[in-house]
Regions:
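Secretory pathway export signals and precursors
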Residues: 1, 30-31, 56, 457, ...
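Extreme N-terminal basic, low-complexity initiation segments
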Residues: 2-10
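Charged/polar low-complexity intrinsically disordered segments
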Residues: 14-16, 23
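N-terminal chloroplast transit peptides
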Residues: 21-22, 26-40, 44-89
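Cleavable N-terminal signal peptides
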Residues: 65, 104-106
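Peripheral terminal and linker regions in Fe-S/redox and tRNA-modifying enzymes
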Residues: 109-696
């Protein structure tokens, strides 16, 4: 174990900080040589760092290191992370050399943070308002008439006027330092700072469920990760109690880290930046994670590779992950998705802006037809509607910026239930909105004039060639399991992650598997699952035998009939951590699907989504069967009398569909008690009647 353990060193020079991970093995000289070569390539001005690296490598070759990694927080409290289960149970594999700050992972379409030779490297925690990255707070960018409407607006608008949420970009580090120094506690923070404004820094205080602990929501454009990211996530949450320190994959191809304490945020945020990830503008009135195709660049049926497009849009929104005050004071949250194929793996139909690939009928150039206005809320759910605009792929970020700035300045600052983009569109009418966006685009990008005025293009696959006959509907593909890529000799392997919940030891095991089979690349899906791309076909059978996928939790379906209910399972956080949720979801969802699979024979995949409340973070309306937390009552004998008492319950939705011809499901039954003795019989009846299930 000692020989296989990792050692983490910080090699400092006058200009750079390079995070290195070296394998401690008796044959570490080749590793040292490779490390030195990489260091010189990326840092030719730092020979002293090279010499220190050689010295450190020589030392670690001679001296075994304990398998437990000692991690010291910035508060000076030494915390020990014991070996994760993956070290012994899953078998720790040899890790790739990681130059976390400088490595470019080309296969992932991911470039980690680069060093600016002119200006020097600046940590996230070193940025200040008034600098070039943040010239002024977000409120300062609002036009006078927008501020006047905000002054008459809802309580959140007044809170933002009192102090802009973008202030949290900087203040999160001030709060963390004060807590580390013992000059304050989280309880002493202004409640609006702790529970609202810190969301601009991606921090969600779970006051109701886990007081003093935060969830951090990241920005992971297109769901692209590396093994180094996954290990960093595991190390981050692994120091906290097992019941709170977990990793969740979200329905936006994103990551949420749970159980984090505020004093540790600076270390975490700087570590994210060093790895090319960001936490800024992931909550409240900001644009959420950019969603794209999880099989971009490897899909045989791909129309557009969404990776660079999603990253470009995200870079525009977040100022390359540093934080962008200019777009940090929207009237409400905003979602953008970019589809790469007819399957629409990004679910564009439920986003404020959806980009759906389509060639220009005259030039043949591939671009996007734009749909707008999709969203879920307590009071209303809405599918996106056509905007009748086609844009070039190269103009996607520009178009999104024009829409966002127009929405920022003109969207409602009153009733927050009527502040999403669709309400502005309906107030203006689609023709008026379309013209306003075209004018805004031309004003912002005069050299691209007319780029947002091209009418939507006909989809060539909508009718059979040379006829007016509609083609057969395109069935959305299931990307779990093993699938051939467009690159000869390679496959992607889709892994089911039950309800999207990952424990630290599991994250370590996933990272090791990625290093062994997919060049360290990991991708996330909106169904809360994981994709390993670029797996050599000669290695697929070996991957399928990995212990992680054969212990009854994670699984890789081998046929369309394997795990018919578990494979499509999606769940929000539920009441375990979310104070808004009415019911517990994740554990209940996993258990119910397993019980139903044990008792029923189901010959087709059935997508089941759980969401804890009407906000529908679990997207119950797009599922074959959706279960939404709600009130229910059961009869119970109390003091000799039968009375109806309130219990956790669900409203059941049926008929949702995603893909080329999406449809939102409708309520089938309300007020069903969530207890299995009530829920299982009803679910069985639905599966038998609607999906042909039979008792085993």
């Amino acid at each position: 174990d000692d020989a296989a353990s990792d050692n983490h060193f910080i090699v400092e020079s006058q200009e750079k900080i390079i995070y290195l991970t070296l394998q401690v093995r008796s044959s570490s000289l080749p590793t040292t040589i490779c490390c030195t070569e990489a260091l010189l390539r990326n840092n030719p001005k730092a020979p002293f760092s090279m010499l220190r690296l050689l010295l450190l490598s020589a030392i670690c070759t001679a001296i075994p290191v304990n398998a437990a990694i000692r991690r010291t927080s910035l508060s000076g409290v030494s915390r020990s992370t014991t070996p994760h289960r993956s070290t012994k149970e899953f078998g720790r594999k040899k890790r790739m050399l990681r130059l976390s700050k400088f490595t470019t992972t080309a296969t992932a379409g991911f470039t980690e943070s680069s060093y600016d030779d002119d200006n020097g490297y600046k940590k996230a925690s070193e940025r200040r308002f008034g600098d070039s990255d943040w010239p002024q707070y977000g409120t300062k960018y609002l036009p006078k008439q927008t501020i006047e409407r905000a002054e008459r607006g809802n309580k959140i608008e007044k809170l933002k006027l009192e102090k802009c949420g973008s202030a949290a970009f900087e203040e999160v580090h001030e709060f963390a330092a004060a807590i580390r120094e013992g000059t304050t506690t989280w309880e002493d923070l202004d409640i609006d700072d702790a529970d609202v404004r810190l969301k601009w820094a991606g921090l969600f205080h779970r006051r109701k469920r886990t007081p003093g602990r935060f969830m951090m929501r990241l920005k992971v454009p297109n769901g692209l990760l590396t093994s180094d990211h996954m290990r960093f996530f595991a190390d981050t949450v692994g120091i906290y109690p097992a019941d709170v320190g977990v990793i969740d994959i979200t329905t936006r191809q994103n990551i949420q880290l749970r159980g984090i304490e505020l004093q540790d945020m600076t270390e975490l945020i700087d570590g994210l930046q060093m790895r090319g990830l960001s936490n800024v503008q992931s909550g409240m009135d900001n644009v959420r994670n950019l969603v794209g195709s999880p099989i971009a660049g490897i899909d045989p049926e791909e129309l557009v590779d969404t990776r660079d497009i999603a990253k470009d849009i995200d870079a525009m929104i977040t100022n390359d992950g540093k934080g962008n005050p200019k777009l940090a004071n929207l009237p409400r949250k905003f979602n953008i998705a970019v589809s790469g194929s007819r399957d629409d793996f990004a679910h564009t139909s439920i986003n404020d802006i959806g980009l759906r690939p389509c060639p220009n009928k005259e030039s043949g150039e591939m671009g996007f037809n734009v749909i707008v206005g999709g969203y879920f809320s307590i009071k209303r759910v809405m599918e996106s509607i056509p905007m009748d605009i086609w844009i070039k792929a190269e103009d996607a970020a520009r178009f999104c910026e024009a829409v966002l700035l127009y929405f920022r300045d003109n969207g409602s600052r009153g009733d927050r239930q009527k502040a999403r983009l669709i309400w502005l569109i309906e107030d203006m009418g689609m023709e008026g909105f379309r013209q306003a966006i075209s004018d805004k685009y031309d004003e912002m990008f005069p050299k691209k004039k007319g780029g947002a005025a091209i009418p939507a293009q006909p989809e060539p696959w909508a009718v059979a060639a040379g006829t007016n006959t509609p083609t057969q509907p395109h069935k959305k593909r299931d990307i779990l399991g093993v699938h051939s890529q467009k690159q000869e000799g390679l496959s992607w392997v889709g892994i089911n992650v039950p309800a999207g919940r990952i424990l630290p030891d599991e994250a370590m095991a996933l990272a090791d598997i990625a290093d062994k089979y997919s060049q360290g690349e990991i991708r996330l899906t909106v169904e809360q699952n994981v994709i390993f791309p670029n797996v050599n076909n000669t290695k697929v059978s070996e991957l399928l035998q990995e212990p992680l996928f054969n212990i009854g939790h994670y699984f890789i379906p081998k046929t369309d009939k394997d795990f018919p209910l578990s494979r499509g399972l999606v769940s929000c956080t539920g009441s375990q951590f979310c104070g808004v949720a009415l019911i517990e979801t994740k554990n209940r969802a996993i258990e119910l699907s397993k019980r139903l699979e044990e008792e029923l024979k189901v010959d087709m995949p059935v997508r089941i989504h759980w969401t804890g409340c009407p906000n529908s973070c679990g997207q119950a309306q797009v599922a074959d069967i959706g279960l939404m937390g709600g009130p229910a009552r059961v009869e119970k004998e109390i003091d000799g009398k039968v009375k109806k008492v309130a219990v956790e319950g669900v409203n059941i939705f049926l008929g949702g569909k995603v893909g080329e011809d999406p449809f939102l499901g409708e309520v089938y039954k309300k007020g069903v008690p969530a207890d299995y003795k009530y829920l299982i019989p009803i679910m069985k009846d639905i599966l038998k009647e609607k999906f042909g299930a039979m008792e085993k």
